[in-house]
Amino acid sequence: MESQCDYSMYFPAVPLPPRAELAGDPGRYRALPRRNHLYLGETVRFLLVLRCRGSVGAGVGGGAGLASRGAWTELATSLAALASVSAGGALPGCGSAGDQDADPPGGGDPGGGGLFRGCSPLLTHGQGPATSGGATTLPVEEPIVSTDEVIFPLTVSLDRLPPGTPKAKIVVTVWKREVEAPEVRDQGYLRLLQTRSPGETFRGEQSAFKAQVSTLLTLLPPPVLKCRQFTVAGKHLTVLKVLNSSSQEEISIWDIRILPNFNASYLPVMPDGSVLLVDNVCHQSGEVSMGSFCRLPGTSGYFPCPLSALEEHNFLFQLRGGEQPPPGAKEGLEVPLIAVVQWSTPKLPFTQSIYTHYRLPSVRLDRPCFVMTASCESPVRTYERFTVTYTLLNNLQDFLAVRLVWTPEHAQAGKQLCEEERRAMQAALDSIVCHTPLNNLGFSRKGSALTFSVAFQALRTGLFELSQHMKLKLQFTASVSHPPPEARPLSRKSSPSSPAVRDLVERHQASLGRSQSFSHQQPSRSHLMRSGSVMERRAITPPVASPVGRPLYLPPDKAVLSLDKIAKRECKVLVVEPVK
């Protein structure tokens, strides 16, 4: 019987007519425009048309199968169909667009596109939560039976296909619904198989109507998403670039969000069924909430945002949170992120919008424990005295003394500048005069805040930075570790001219009191001991004599302070001409 029917699948590009119109005019579907591609994540409605070959009522094969109108009507009313979808093409290889758009080593032009990283899609689904597993909640409609054909309105969702699937294989299975025999209802198949042979039990079902129809359609991927993360004055900013690169149709961006990926905080399930948390990964707590990333408003940040073919749009987000870590916060907290983009096209006849989830690079929250901020009135007039207020927030450790030193003459130290750049920098340095270049703030206890005002005067107009050349000098007491058991003590009775004793005394003096200064540009850990304007380390405590006979040892030479725990915030002032 299956060979006596023709099968056709119609994917309309417009909403289907009402069921009553299709039943009254079954051939109306032929005039509907068809689609030649689909979108990953959308819900597709289509028609499977089963048509009887020849005219109903004429003898087919000597009266077998569908020889009469009654036989066709009986078969058509007992048919059922179910659609499924699977990946129909070879998945892309390991090299993806996200790998090609990775950050180049050594950075690049801050305004160039090379600093944007490609973000791979994780999941794409339609309105509402994505269906999981093999279960489906899509509606099943009864077929429309006409004189010589049966129309099956079918629905299939494309949200379970892997990201990057190039083609979708849609398979429709058609079978004849039969009423179970009374003996099957009474005894069940297990009892019948135990008392009869399988061939005798299923002989009647071998002649039942069964057919399977499939087609292959092109899948268009979601919009391309790229990401760039940077920090400005201690604020974590993220720029998301959305690009319509695969569709020639216009798409609309309805919403875009950045959320913490709490699922990445868990390790795989242990054999006993327990689940462990990753220590340095943010989990569901008060550190980073679902609303921590806020989209900053802009002149072009309205929704919906239309994107034509090959058009892109940028969205700016900021991580909102306290600059100082909360009590009990972990150092170097890593926050896995995902981006959710809601988009649509006018060619989605049955889906209002599609949601695509992208994997973003993680953000590491290295909050500084010692922060220097500055504020002043702006603008100011030339030759007018103005005051800059510096605030030191100390959550690092106790310091014996804190000093602010205005040292613009060291700005060019260690830099290879051309003549034009040197003249421009020198002109900028000569434009600002500090009335009190040396300021002693005294003792700073951990958890305290120091505020100090410094007077300046501007000699030229322009925009000037007032934190870069204000060097921060911190004096602290270095902890002296206990000598290891295998260390051999040295006595003062040794010869004063001994090189070992002289080296020991110098290093012991340096361990009692140390000073470090920090400029606006923070070096990396590998340059911790670099001399110059960035950081200086020297002994400031006079030599302290050791009692005769008391053993001395050589303390380990290690970095006492880590530069990533100290930060300085920019402060700029605009200098204008006086009003005449």
From Swiss-Prot:
The gene is Trappc14. It comes from Mus musculus. InterPro entries: TRAPP14_C, TRAPP14_N, TRAPPC14. One of its GO terms (molecular function) is alpha-tubulin binding. This is Trafficking protein particle complex subunit 14. Residues 492-502 have a biased composition (Low complexity). GO terms for cellular component: centriolar satellite; midbody; mitotic spindle; plasma membrane; TRAPPII protein complex. Specific subunit of the TRAPP (transport protein particle) II complex, a highly conserved vesicle tethering complex that functions in late Golgi trafficking as a membrane tether. TRAPPC14 is dispensable for TRAPPII complex integrity but mediates RAB3IP preciliary vesicle trafficking to the mother centriole during ciliogenesis. Modulates YAP1 activity as transcriptional regulator. Residues 105-116 have a biased composition (Gly residues). Keywords: Cilium biogenesis/degradation, Cytoplasm, Cytoskeleton, Phosphoprotein. The modification Phosphoserine is found at S491, S517, S546. GO terms for biological process: cilium assembly; regulation of cell population proliferation. Residues 512-525 have a biased composition (Polar residues). Pfam families: TRAPP14_C (PF23652), TRAPP14_N (PF15806). Residues 95-134, 480-533 are annotated as: Disordered. Component of the multisubunit TRAPP II complex, which includes at least TRAPPC1, TRAPPC2, TRAPPC2L, TRAPPC3, TRAPPC4, TRAPPC5, TRAPPC6A/B, TRAPPC9, TRAPPC10 and TRAPPC14. TRAPPC9, TRAPPC10 and TRAPPC14 are specific subunits of the TRAPP II complex. Interacts with alpha-tubulin during mitosis. Interacts with RAB3IP (via the N-terminal region); this interaction mediates RAB3IP association with the TRAPP II complex. Interacts with TRAPPC10. Interacts with FBF1. It comes from the Eukaryota. The lineage of its organism: Eukaryota, Metazoa, Chordata, Craniata, Vertebrata. PANTHER family: MICROTUBULE-ASSOCIATED PROTEIN 11, TRAFFICKING PROTEIN PARTICLE COMPLEX SUBUNIT 14. The modification Phosphothreonine is found at T541. It is found in: Cytoplasm, Cytoskeleton, Spindle; Vesicle; Midbody.
